[in-house]
């Protein structure tokens, strides 16, 4: 990462990581596609309803894995092998602890929070059931994310790909068995996800224990190092806050979608707008995951070059990241829009009459307003990733808070309240992305100028 061509190395690093992340998203996609075959009318909407809340709880705690990624990468870049090993063992302990804590909190508050978001009757029952089972596997999910962060920090994106490929197939297999053979619904796909996450967590830790570098896991060295913990929290806490704030604003989005649903389909047991929103949100998850992989790559490349003091390469990392993420976003978003009919049918959303038409139209509105301009979010993620790579995680969190979350909340309280339409909800996404991306890019430019200025000054003094 600190030598040679950046673009080529970044592509080789990002592609397997992208495939790995897409497999994790495929877990949820498989859940929703298979559960659409069950006897429950609101099953797809129930799973989609839980996304923002689940992410609010888990992303805060799992967000600390960003800190582990950055700190380990910086230690490796600085050739500090022993310190890197301490960070690895500290991060794995932290992963289990935050997973248990997040799981307990999520399990307890699931029903009241989902009810507060506007879910009721059958939708509330299904969403609560799915969420509570999902949170039972939170420790495995957290450990998986922390182990993956270790592999990525040392430049190995292939091992997580192989492990998650296998566990992903197991997840789909259990989905089909639980739903089609045993007649289960959201509970079946939730348990399938828990089982697959447990398998991936155990397998990744096993692989770490057999690695031959400073990131090797050794049970005898499993202890919390205070310095490592402090560094992880310093960078990971703001990243967790940033993820949680995004999820909070998305919860408000989900609540607003439910309000529009009640306007368009009053008194209906079936929630067509919720179903359409859930299907497209799941498809958009593939775009976000693909582009976020580029952002994570920019974090790793920036962190190692910052650790090695090679600030001139960071600008090249930025340019390469923007180029890759733009191409990836446009390919995914245009593909989803072009093949919308076929993709939506996988979730049971078809262009028919009555309530089915409302579900389909709602999905298409979301695609036009949110899916097509997703490349703007990709820019935002790269800029914020480079800022985190500099170790300025708090700065990145503040930018996201003001530019994306706060603006989106204000938008919902003003613009949406005036129009009460789906368009007035979804257009808030590209507007907030663009503002945040612009602010983040200014910060990146200032950071590069600062370090290049210091380098020039030091060279002058040495001369």
Annotate each language-model stretch with its function:
Residues 1-14, 72-139, 170, 181-237, ...:
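Short alpha-helical transmembrane segments in multi-pass integral membrane proteins
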Residues 3, 7-26, 30, 53-60, ...:
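Residue-level signal for short hydrophobic patches within transmembrane helices
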Residues 12-31, 133, 167, 196-200, ...:
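Transmembrane helical elements of multi-pass membrane transporters/channels
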Residues 17, 21, 33, 70, ...:
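Transmembrane alpha-helix boundary and packing residues in multipass membrane permease domains
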Residues 22, 26-44, 114-121, 177-184, ...:
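Helix-terminus/linker motif at the lipid-water interface of multi-pass membrane proteins
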Residues 41-52, 127, 131, 190, ...:
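Small-residue hotspots at the loop-to-helix junctions and early N-terminal turns
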Residues 44-104, 141-160, 254, 274-340, ...:
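Small-residue-rich hydrophobic transmembrane alpha-helices
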Residues 65, 134-152, 160-171, 189-204, ...:
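Short runs within selected transmembrane alpha-helices of multi-pass transporters and secretion channels
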């Amino acid at each position: 990462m600190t030598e040679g061509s950046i673009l080529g190395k970044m592509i080789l690093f990002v592609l397997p990581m992208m495939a790995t992340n897409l497999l994790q998203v495929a877990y949820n996609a498989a859940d929703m596609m298979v559960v659409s075959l069950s006897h429950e009318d609101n099953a797809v909407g129930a799973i989609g309803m839980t996304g923002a809340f689940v992410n609010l709880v888990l992303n805060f705690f799992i967000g600390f894995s960003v800190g582990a990624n950055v700190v380990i990468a910086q230690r490796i870049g600085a050739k500090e092998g022993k310190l890197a090993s301490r960070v690895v063992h500290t991060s794995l302990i932290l992963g289990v602890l935050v997973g248990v804590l997040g799981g307990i909190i999520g399990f307890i508050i699931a029903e009241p929070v989902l009810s507060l978001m506007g879910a009721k009757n059958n939708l509330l029952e299904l969403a609560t059931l799915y969420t509570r089972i999902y949170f039972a596997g939170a420790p495995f999910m957290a450990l998986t994310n922390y182990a993956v962060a270790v592999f990525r920090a040392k430049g190995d994106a292939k091992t997580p790909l192989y492990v998650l490929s296998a566990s992903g197939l197991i997840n789909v297999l259990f989905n089909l068995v639980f739903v089609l053979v045993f007649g289960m619904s959201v509970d079946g796909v939730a348990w399938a996800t828990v089982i697959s996450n447990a398998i991936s967590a155990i397998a990744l830790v096993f692989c770490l224990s057999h690695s031959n570098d400073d990131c090797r896991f050794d049970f005898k060295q499993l202890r919390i190092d205070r310095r490592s913990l402090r560094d992880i929290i310093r960078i990971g806490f703001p990243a967790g806050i940033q993820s949680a704030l995004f999820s909070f604003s998305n919860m408000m989005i989900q609540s607003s979608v439910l309000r529009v649903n009640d306007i368009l389909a009053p008194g209906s047991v079936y929630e067509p707008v919720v179903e359409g929103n859930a299907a497209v949100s799941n498809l958009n998850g593939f775009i976000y995951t693909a582009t976020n992989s580029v952002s994570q790559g920019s974090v790793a490349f920036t962190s190692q070059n910052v650790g090695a003091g090679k600030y001139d390469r960071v600008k090249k990392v930025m340019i390469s990241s923007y180029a890759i993420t733009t191409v990836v976003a446009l390919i995914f978003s245009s593909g989803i829009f072009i093949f919308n009919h076929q993709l939506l049918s996988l979730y049971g959303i078809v262009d028919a009459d009555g309530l089915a038409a409302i579900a389909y139209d709602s999905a298409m509105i979301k695609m036009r307003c949110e899916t097509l301009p997703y490349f703007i979010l990709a820019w935002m993620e790269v800029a914020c990733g480079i800022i985190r790579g500099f170790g300025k995680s708090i700065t990145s969190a503040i930018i996201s808070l003001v530019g994306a979350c706060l603006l989106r909340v204000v938008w919902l309280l003003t613009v949406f309240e005036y129009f009460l339409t789906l368009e007035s909800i979804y257009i808030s996404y590209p507007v907030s992305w663009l503002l945040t991306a612009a602010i983040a890019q200014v910060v990146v430019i200032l950071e590069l100028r600062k370090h290049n200025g210091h380098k020039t000054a030091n060279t002058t003094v040495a001369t």
